[in-house]
Amino acid sequence: MADNLCRRCRAALAKEKRENLTVETKFEFVDKTYASYRYEGARRKGIQNAKFRRPASFLNSFLTDISRDIEKILGENNFDTVISSPAHKSKFYKTEYDLPEQMAKRISEKFSLNNRRPVVKIKKTKTQHSLKLEERKANLIDAFEVRLDIKDKSILLIDDVISTGQTVSVIAKELKLAGAKTVVVWAYAYNDGKEK
């Protein structure tokens, strides 16, 4: 994303980098949360374009943007597998791709990590960012199901944006109920509870 940019644009993007990779907010059932950027400015626009219009340019520079962060996370944790926050199959009819899944795939290939899809989204839900906190909780009831054996596994869960953490909390709960040892979350951007 920062490729082929002028010096001023590159500096503007650098300002959106989070000073601390660790997210201090604790999300239920999640052992630790990391995020690389603040969800604002060019990063916010880039994610929205990637999610809803043009993923190619975002994904082409994605690993350049976050490789150092992932290396640090891998240095602090031992993971058995990397997974993505799953989308309902109906989303593929509209966009033909799932951004977190593509992110997880690239991370697993770059860092030689096992990439599995143990969790599926079995219920079509409303878009989270359009809902209030209590509505978000209700929206995700019975939305996910674990379909692969993840007993005693340490999992890195990938998402594009986190704020209230409802989605990753529900997924982490299902993983823990299925026997996962630890669930650590990394998101490209963190929004301090204002979106998603």
Please annotate each region the language model reported.
Residues 1-196:
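Glycine-rich phosphate/pyrophosphate-handling loop used in enzymes and phosphotransfer proteins
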